[in-house]
Amino acid sequence: MSSEIIGTKFKYTVDTSYGINQDGFIAIGTESIVYRGLKTADKGGLQFSCVLKFKPKYVYVNGTKIDRVKVFKDEELKIFEDLQECRSIVRIYDVIESLGDFSLPCDKIKSGVINASGYFCVVEEYIDGWSLEEYCRQERWKLRKIEQLENNLSKVVDYHEYTEDE
């Protein structure tokens, strides 16, 4: 078993200096298990942070087995490639179909391990900062205004209640 993933031009490892449990874990979503990783040239040298998104190779939809690697490469990756000039879209560095002998214990999934038999990896640019959820929670209060009512009273108006002119 290995803690290293061999990509197209780089080697990748999970950044075990990151996270509450020092395991590199960032989040788990509907499509991926996300870890902070380190990207290193094959011959060593500088390391750069990246995001390692481990996605299931196959999912079942209404009893039909769907090849997620094929769907990702044929559909989703093409959309990302078309948007690479847009700076607000994260960059995809690599798509690794076979994880080789890579193995990562993960108590957040039923099988308990991320490996080549069940997952492929999408390597993305790492952008430090708030998650979208954190940002929305922090900024939500700024999307309100106060309207003065009669009798010295005020009313808080949420953004979704603004008129079209505002």
Question: How would you name each of these model-derived features?
Answer:
Residues 41-48, 101-118:
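Short, solvent-exposed loop/turn segments that connect beta-strands within catalytic domains
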Residues 143-165:
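Conserved short alpha-helix within the protein kinase catalytic core
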Residues 4-41:
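ATP-binding glycine-rich phosphate-binding loop
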Residues 32, 87-90, 130:
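Glycine-centered loop/turn positions within well-structured domains
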Residues 132-145:
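AlphaC helix of the protein kinase catalytic domain
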Residues 114-131:
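Conserved short submotifs of the Hanks-type protein kinase catalytic core
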Residues 32-81:
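ATP-binding glycine-rich loop module of kinase domains
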Residues 85-110:
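Conserved HxN/HPN-centered segment at the entrance to the catalytic loop
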